[in-house]
Amino acid sequence: MKRKLVDFCIISLPQHNERRDKLKNEMAKYDIECRVSHAIDGRKLLAEKYFSLFKIRSSKMFGRGFLTPSELGCFLSHKKALTEFLASGRKWLVVLEDDVLPKENVKYLDEMINSFCSSSVYILGGQDGLKSFSRVIMGRKSICGVRKVILGTHRWLYRTCCYCVDIKGAERILRLMEENSFFCDDWSYIVRNAKLDNVFYGQYFSHPLNLNSSSIEAERLFIAEK
């Protein structure tokens, strides 16, 4: 596939120069050029903005009905990246958060995307260290380097650190984001309410096991302790 049809986008807070440069350099080794979409730091939102958007209708986090500041920032950052993609004229979007690292098979990803299905979401890895991933059931047959997630077990997939959608899928997700807020990695809610056709999974990127630098994780731990 001609790369001009694929938008490889790194979501990164402006101050995280080192992290995004490392990822850009790693991707460049496989002849993949990435653009940067500067993330929105939810901790710096005005109170009026935060309280107008923090309530959610569906929750993966033990019934919690609101987003923390960093979770809302994540939501708005992905919404921004999707909006930028739809204005770009490209056909496919690969979203990467700046803490992932590519596996060697990422060199085939561009070619594989050419055979991906429309109106679906492709989770490209990033489940490292998550016990929930053992509950995900996938088809045995690997097509285009990915396997279909079946029996509704995509509810056990977490993180938005690496995924791929086409124009139709992006439009549907963005439309849902315009309607209300939700956890960015609530894939069950997204697939159901954005009316996406399928979820596929492939191992193209890894996520660090150490989450000490994650503001989202810090806020979740703070709430859990209360």
Predicted regions and their residues:
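An acidic/histidine-cluster motif and surrounding catalytic segment
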Residues: M1-L96, V100-K226
